[in-house]
């Protein structure tokens, strides 16, 4: 239930580019309960890293993950 799920907020955003090969998934933080919007990348190692959604490498990584995670069409 989205109403009762805990909200994860990012208070510090990395400025360091993360290699696309290390990324497994992402989710956007857009809750009004959070001080800033962010993208949380989950790495293959299981770490969660907050990033600035407007940064060019973040947008490139998101589109890379979207393409990678699309199920092949029959």
From Swiss-Prot:
The N-terminus is blocked. GO terms for molecular function: CCR chemokine receptor binding; chemokine activity; heparin binding. One of its GO terms (biological process) is positive regulation of cell migration. Signal peptide: none annotated. Disulfide bonds join 9-34, 10-50. The keyword Cell cycle does not apply. InterPro entries: Chemokine_b/g/d (IPR039809), Chemokine_CC_CS (IPR000827), Chemokine_IL8-like_dom (IPR001811), Interleukin_8-like_sf (IPR036048). One of its GO terms (cellular component) is extracellular space. Keywords: Chemotaxis, Cytokine, Disulfide bond, Heparin-binding. Transmembrane segments: none annotated. Chemotactic factor that attracts monocytes, but not neutrophils. Augments monocyte anti-tumor activity. Also induces the release of gelatinase B. This protein can bind heparin. Belongs to the intercrine beta (chemokine CC) family. This is Monocyte chemotactic protein 1B. It comes from Bos taurus (Bovine).
């Amino acid at each position: 239930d989205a109403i009762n799920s805990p909200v994860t907020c990012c208070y510090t955003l990395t400025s360091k580019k993360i290699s696309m090969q290390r990324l497994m998934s992402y989710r956007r933080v857009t809750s009004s309960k959070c001080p800033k919007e962010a993208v949380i990348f989950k790495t293959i190692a299981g770490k969660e890293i907050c990033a600035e959604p407007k940064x060019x490498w973040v947008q490139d990584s998101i589109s890379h993950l979207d393409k990678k995670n699309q199920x092949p069409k029959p």
